[in-house]
Design a protein with these regions (language model features):
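Structural signature of tandem alpha-helical TPR/SEL1-like repeats
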Residues: 2-9, 36-45, 71-90, 117-126, ...
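Canonical positions in the second alpha-helix
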Residues: 12-14, 48-49, 92-94, 129-130, ...
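Short helix-capping/linker turns of helical repeat alpha-solenoids
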Residues: 17-19, 32-33, 52-55, 68, ...
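TPR/TPR-like alpha-solenoid helical repeat scaffolds
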Residues: 141-144, 148, 172-176
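Alpha-helical tetratricopeptide repeat
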Residues: 8, 12, 20-24, 28, ...
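Hydrophobic face of amphipathic alpha-helices that form TPR/SEL1-like repeat modules
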Residues: 25-32, 60-74, 103-112, 144-148
Length: 176
Protein backbone atom coordinates (compact mmCIF):
# COMPACT_ATOMS: atom_id res chain seq x y z
CA UNK A 1 0.00 0.00 0.00
CA UNK A 2 1.41 3.43 -0.92
CA UNK A 3 2.60 5.52 1.98
CA UNK A 4 0.87 8.82 2.75
CA UNK A 5 3.01 11.93 3.26
CA UNK A 6 3.75 13.20 6.77
CA UNK A 7 1.50 16.19 7.34
CA UNK A 8 2.35 18.54 10.23
CA UNK A 9 -0.62 19.09 12.57
CA UNK A 10 0.06 22.84 12.65
CA UNK A 11 -0.31 22.98 8.86
CA UNK A 12 -3.65 21.15 9.03
CA UNK A 13 -4.84 23.53 11.75
CA UNK A 14 -3.92 26.58 9.66
CA UNK A 15 -5.58 25.11 6.58
CA UNK A 16 -8.72 24.25 8.52
CA UNK A 17 -9.02 27.85 9.72
CA UNK A 18 -9.06 29.08 6.12
CA UNK A 19 -5.42 29.96 5.49
CA UNK A 20 -5.14 29.61 1.71
CA UNK A 21 -1.33 29.31 1.76
CA UNK A 22 -1.58 26.40 4.19
CA UNK A 23 -4.37 24.84 2.13
CA UNK A 24 -2.25 24.99 -1.00
CA UNK A 25 0.80 23.64 0.82
CA UNK A 26 -1.34 20.71 2.00
CA UNK A 27 -2.48 20.12 -1.58
CA UNK A 28 1.12 19.98 -2.75
CA UNK A 29 2.11 17.59 0.04
CA UNK A 30 -0.81 15.25 -0.64
CA UNK A 31 -0.05 15.31 -4.36
CA UNK A 32 3.38 13.79 -3.66
CA UNK A 33 1.67 10.60 -2.49
CA UNK A 34 0.85 7.65 -4.73
CA UNK A 35 -2.22 6.89 -2.62
CA UNK A 36 -5.43 7.64 -4.57
CA UNK A 37 -7.18 9.01 -1.46
CA UNK A 38 -4.33 11.48 -0.93
CA UNK A 39 -4.58 12.64 -4.55
CA UNK A 40 -8.27 13.34 -3.92
CA UNK A 41 -7.34 15.29 -0.76
CA UNK A 42 -4.79 17.27 -2.78
CA UNK A 43 -7.50 18.34 -5.19
CA UNK A 44 -9.91 19.21 -2.36
CA UNK A 45 -7.37 21.40 -0.57
CA UNK A 46 -6.31 23.10 -3.79
CA UNK A 47 -9.96 23.84 -4.60
CA UNK A 48 -10.40 25.41 -1.15
CA UNK A 49 -7.30 27.57 -1.61
CA UNK A 50 -8.36 28.59 -5.12
CA UNK A 51 -11.84 29.50 -3.89
CA UNK A 52 -10.13 31.89 -1.46
CA UNK A 53 -8.26 33.55 -4.33
CA UNK A 54 -4.92 31.70 -4.14
CA UNK A 55 -3.59 32.30 -7.66
CA UNK A 56 -0.96 29.52 -7.55
CA UNK A 57 -3.67 27.04 -6.52
CA UNK A 58 -5.78 28.19 -9.46
CA UNK A 59 -2.89 27.68 -11.86
CA UNK A 60 -1.97 24.34 -10.26
CA UNK A 61 -5.53 23.07 -10.67
CA UNK A 62 -5.68 24.26 -14.27
CA UNK A 63 -2.40 22.56 -15.13
CA UNK A 64 -3.39 19.37 -13.33
CA UNK A 65 -6.78 19.14 -15.00
CA UNK A 66 -5.25 19.85 -18.42
CA UNK A 67 -2.62 17.14 -17.92
CA UNK A 68 -5.28 14.62 -16.88
CA UNK A 69 -7.54 15.60 -19.80
CA UNK A 70 -4.72 15.03 -22.28
CA UNK A 71 -4.16 11.55 -20.84
CA UNK A 72 -7.89 10.77 -21.14
CA UNK A 73 -8.32 12.20 -24.64
CA UNK A 74 -7.87 8.89 -26.51
CA UNK A 75 -9.77 6.51 -24.23
CA UNK A 76 -12.61 8.76 -23.08
CA UNK A 77 -13.03 11.96 -25.14
CA UNK A 78 -16.18 12.99 -23.26
CA UNK A 79 -14.47 12.77 -19.86
CA UNK A 80 -11.42 14.54 -21.29
CA UNK A 81 -13.66 17.38 -22.44
CA UNK A 82 -14.99 17.73 -18.89
CA UNK A 83 -11.48 18.02 -17.49
CA UNK A 84 -10.43 20.45 -20.22
CA UNK A 85 -13.41 22.52 -19.08
CA UNK A 86 -12.17 22.45 -15.47
CA UNK A 87 -8.66 23.34 -16.64
CA UNK A 88 -9.91 26.24 -18.74
CA UNK A 89 -11.96 27.56 -15.81
CA UNK A 90 -9.04 27.63 -13.38
CA UNK A 91 -6.49 28.90 -15.88
CA UNK A 92 -8.89 31.69 -16.79
CA UNK A 93 -9.28 32.57 -13.08
CA UNK A 94 -5.50 32.67 -12.61
CA UNK A 95 -5.07 34.64 -15.84
CA UNK A 96 -7.55 37.24 -14.58
CA UNK A 97 -5.15 37.74 -11.66
CA UNK A 98 -2.24 38.25 -14.11
CA UNK A 99 -0.52 34.87 -13.59
CA UNK A 100 1.80 34.87 -16.64
CA UNK A 101 2.17 31.10 -16.99
CA UNK A 102 -1.59 30.60 -16.70
CA UNK A 103 -2.08 33.19 -19.43
CA UNK A 104 0.37 31.33 -21.66
CA UNK A 105 -1.39 28.00 -20.99
CA UNK A 106 -4.74 29.63 -21.74
CA UNK A 107 -3.31 30.78 -25.09
CA UNK A 108 -2.84 27.12 -25.96
CA UNK A 109 -6.55 26.46 -25.44
CA UNK A 110 -7.37 29.09 -28.07
CA UNK A 111 -4.63 27.89 -30.42
CA UNK A 112 -5.85 24.27 -30.28
CA UNK A 113 -9.56 24.92 -29.77
CA UNK A 114 -9.78 22.97 -26.49
CA UNK A 115 -13.29 23.64 -25.04
CA UNK A 116 -13.28 27.06 -26.71
CA UNK A 117 -13.61 28.08 -30.33
CA UNK A 118 -10.23 28.05 -32.04
CA UNK A 119 -9.07 31.67 -32.17
CA UNK A 120 -5.50 32.28 -33.33
CA UNK A 121 -5.75 36.05 -32.80
CA UNK A 122 -6.87 35.55 -29.17
CA UNK A 123 -4.08 33.02 -28.68
CA UNK A 124 -1.46 35.47 -29.93
CA UNK A 125 -2.94 38.24 -27.78
CA UNK A 126 -2.60 36.03 -24.70
CA UNK A 127 0.97 35.01 -25.59
CA UNK A 128 1.81 38.72 -25.91
CA UNK A 129 0.18 39.46 -22.55
CA UNK A 130 2.17 36.68 -20.85
CA UNK A 131 5.38 37.91 -22.49
CA UNK A 132 4.73 41.46 -21.29
CA UNK A 133 4.28 40.08 -17.76
CA UNK A 134 7.75 38.52 -17.90
CA UNK A 135 7.06 34.90 -18.91
CA UNK A 136 10.24 33.85 -20.77
CA UNK A 137 8.60 30.98 -22.66
CA UNK A 138 5.91 33.37 -23.89
CA UNK A 139 8.67 35.69 -25.11
CA UNK A 140 10.25 32.81 -27.04
CA UNK A 141 6.86 31.80 -28.45
CA UNK A 142 6.12 35.37 -29.51
CA UNK A 143 9.51 35.66 -31.22
CA UNK A 144 8.75 32.43 -33.10
CA UNK A 145 5.32 33.74 -34.09
CA UNK A 146 6.87 36.93 -35.50
CA UNK A 147 9.69 35.03 -37.23
CA UNK A 148 7.33 32.63 -38.96
CA UNK A 149 4.32 34.91 -39.55
CA UNK A 150 2.01 32.57 -37.62
CA UNK A 151 -1.29 34.42 -37.63
CA UNK A 152 0.34 37.84 -37.96
CA UNK A 153 2.72 39.58 -40.34
CA UNK A 154 6.36 38.58 -40.05
CA UNK A 155 8.44 41.14 -38.17
CA UNK A 156 12.15 40.45 -37.73
CA UNK A 157 12.62 43.46 -35.46
CA UNK A 158 9.94 42.29 -33.01
CA UNK A 159 11.20 38.71 -33.22
CA UNK A 160 14.72 39.84 -32.29
CA UNK A 161 13.34 42.07 -29.51
CA UNK A 162 11.47 39.17 -27.89
CA UNK A 163 14.41 36.77 -28.27
CA UNK A 164 16.70 39.31 -26.58
CA UNK A 165 14.18 39.98 -23.83
CA UNK A 166 13.80 36.23 -23.17
CA UNK A 167 17.59 35.86 -23.04
CA UNK A 168 17.78 38.67 -20.47
CA UNK A 169 15.02 37.17 -18.30
CA UNK A 170 16.60 33.72 -18.44
CA UNK A 171 20.02 35.18 -17.61
CA UNK A 172 18.54 36.86 -14.53
CA UNK A 173 17.01 33.53 -13.46
CA UNK A 174 20.38 31.80 -13.82
CA UNK A 175 22.06 34.45 -11.66
CA UNK A 176 19.53 34.10 -8.83
Amino acid sequence: MPKSPKIPAELVNLATTGNSDAQFELAELYMQSENEDDITLAEEWALKAAALGHVEAMYWLGEGYAFYAKELREEDPSEAETYFGHAHHWLKQAAALKHPTAILELAGFYRRGDVVDKDVAKSIELVQQAAELGEAQAMRDLAFIYENALGIDADEVKAKYWHNKADAVEQCLVLK
